[in-house]
């Protein structure tokens, strides 16, 4: 009977299972996010979380232990230099499994597994963007720049309508002619062509 045996063998012999989990753990460390089946993701979570906890120690012995799982220097460097300092204060739970639905070919339940502190979608929404607005302040300071935060404010359309002045009968010579045509409205360009 199979009572109390919780370990998922993933229908593979031990060496194949070890290689699979090692390769997926390397991909997770290098790319911060992988797409796999839910069963493999749950097995990978049990495999990779103790490795990340070991990486928080940052000793030579810890590096050698982690290298014994990966057999590759690149994910070990990335884990100790970038990932471990970022998750140093987190007491476990370094990965997140997001279910994506079923795969078309075999109807396997798919998911996206990612490192928790590396969710780029949430970070982009949280960070305010800084944009540069070009201003012109006289002849001496052409192209002076000022930084403006990108807070979304709705401009008053009535003020813009009263401030806008139509461009009529502009006399332009040489290379500036194309720029003047680009700034005019389509109705004004039709009048000039006639």
Swiss-Prot record:
Keywords: Ribonucleoprotein, Ribosomal protein. PROSITE patterns: RIBOSOMAL_L17 (PS01167). GO terms for cellular component: cytosolic large ribosomal subunit. It comes from the Bacteria. The keyword Electron transport does not apply. Residues 131-140 have a biased composition (Basic residues). Pfam families: Ribosomal_L17 (PF01196). Residues 144-161, 181-194 have a biased composition (Polar residues). NCBIfam families: L17. This is Large ribosomal subunit protein bL17. It comes from Amoebophilus asiaticus (strain 5a2). The lineage of its organism: Bacteria, Pseudomonadati, Bacteroidota, Cytophagia, Cytophagales.
């Amino acid at each position: 009977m199979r009572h109390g045996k919780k370990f998922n063998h993933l229908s593979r012999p031990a060496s194949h299972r070890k290689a699979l989990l090692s390769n997926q753990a390397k991909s997770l460390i290098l790319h911060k996010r992988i797409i796999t089946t839910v069963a493999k993701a749950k097995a990978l979570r049990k495999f990779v979380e103790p490795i990340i906890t070991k990486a928080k120690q940052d000793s030579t012995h810890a590096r050698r232990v982690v290298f014994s799982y990966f057999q590759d220097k690149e994910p070990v460097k990335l884990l100790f230099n970038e990932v471990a300092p970022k998750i140093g204060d987190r007491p476990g739970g370094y990965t997140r499994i997001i279910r994506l639905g079923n795969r078309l070919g075999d109807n396997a339940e798919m998911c996206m597994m990612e490192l928790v502190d590396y969710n780029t979608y949430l970070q982009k929404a949280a960070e305010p963007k800084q944009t540069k607005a070009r201003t012109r302040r006289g002849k001496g300071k052409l192209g002076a720049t000022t930084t403006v935060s990108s807070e979304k404010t709705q401009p008053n359309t009535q003020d813009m309508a009263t401030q806008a002045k139509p461009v009529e009968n502009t006399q332009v010579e040489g290379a500036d002619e194309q720029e003047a045509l680009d700034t005019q409205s389509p109705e004004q360009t039709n009048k000039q062509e006639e």
